[in-house]
Amino acid sequence: MTNRKSLAMVIPMLLAASNGVNALEVFHKHGNKLELYGSINPNHKLNHSFLANKITSHKDDTNAILGLSGEVNIADELFSYATIEYGIDLSVPEQLLDKQQPNNLRLGYAGFKYGNWGSIDYGRNYGVLHDVQALTNRSPYINKDSIFSYNDNYMTGRSNSLLTYKNDDIFGLIDGMSFILQYQDQSENRAQNQTNGPGWGISIKYETDVGLTAIGSCFSSQRFQSDKSNQDNKLTPSVGAYGLGFKYDANDIYIAAFYGEGRNLTPSLNILSDNNASKDQPYINKTQNIEAIAEYNFHSGFHPSLSYLDSKGQNLNIKDATTVPKNLELAKQINISTRYEFNKNISTYMNYTINLLKSDNVIKEQNIPTDNTIGAGIVYHF
């Protein structure tokens, strides 16, 4: 579970930068092209308690991602396109003795684009809330315990059955203004924390010529639940989230902030286990996140950064409510990071996560991590 989570979150920004920028061109003729992109990320992490010299755990998070993107020119301004992206966990043995699946299909979608009318595609893609939450994912080697970046959790992170319409510059009428409309079909026959009912989402972005960008995203869905007592399936409403964010990216400075609020979103199982979660109610009625990051480019290859995350859960619907407060800190951390870019393909990095949560009985019962983490690695991306 931990390996898969780390693989899913560790390098999304590097791949976004490599896709189309540093990608290897396999074929390009008559407006038709096929590109190969990916990354290899050997890295290691050490955990230790606050003010303790003893290392509590070691972890190898080495992974790789490989993607193919293609485009076919159908008519004058009509194109079809497709992307498939695969993640590989390189820290596991060749033959697993259990049924864990360390490798996964991250993305897989296809669609059409027609001039200023925009594009439409369907498949496994990024949820609409990722558009704004990605503003603070500037440091790709930081594993943020943010519920708004979890995958297969409605329209946050990557998810299945997404019909996505994108339009840049509002049909060519307003420079810098773009929007995304998204519909997610019902997903079932999977773990309860990964099912969802149908839902809709929208994201609006405005970019200026001076490096300022503002984004607002939201979605609303129904939660799919299986009532094992009578073997009947039912849909319950009121699952959704919204996020507001901005960034400044100019003059060698990158500053971004994100505020997100969700209702009835499902956290990872290491926070609220199946034994604690109520089968009749969502796990957390209200979740609030504040995220911020600042980075500077020294033009010598060094890119130091400082980031902050504060995630709170309110009105928790879990059993034994007398021993668990209704409001709970899910994550609170500061990340001090730096990376050095040897060239456009190779970089090395180091990150120190200061966990601001204090260990107590409630934190321990909910399996919320409180250790500080040191991580370092090398990334080759193309």
Swiss-Prot record:
Q: What does this protein do?
A: Forms pores that allow passive diffusion of small molecules across the membrane.
Q: Which InterPro entries match?
A: Gram-neg_bact_OMP, Gram_neg_porin_domain, Porin_dom_sf, Porin_gammaproteobac, Porin_Gram-ve
Transferase keyword on record = no
Name the source organism.
Buchnera aphidicola subsp. Acyrthosiphon pisum (strain APS) (Acyrthosiphon pisum symbiotic bacterium)
Q: Record's Pfam families?
A: Porin_1
Q: Mind telling me what this protein is named? A: Porin-like protein BU359
Q: Where in the cell is it found?
A: Cell outer membrane
Tell me which family the UniProt entry assigns to this protein: Belongs to the Gram-negative porin family.
One GO cellular component term noted in the UniProt record for this chain: pore complex
The Gene Ontology terms for molecular function here are: porin activity
As for membrane topology, the entry says: Multi-pass membrane protein
Give start-end of the signal peptide. 1-23
Q: What does the annotation say about its assembly with partners?
A: Homotrimer.
CDD domains with a match to the protein in the record: gram_neg_porins
Q: Which keywords are on file for this protein?
A: Cell outer membrane, Ion transport, Membrane, Porin, Signal, Transmembrane, Transmembrane beta strand, Transport
Covalent S-S links between cysteines: none
Checking PANTHER family in the record gives:
OUTER MEMBRANE PORIN N-RELATED, PROTEIN YDDL-RELATED
Q: Name one GO biological process term.
A: monoatomic ion transmembrane transport
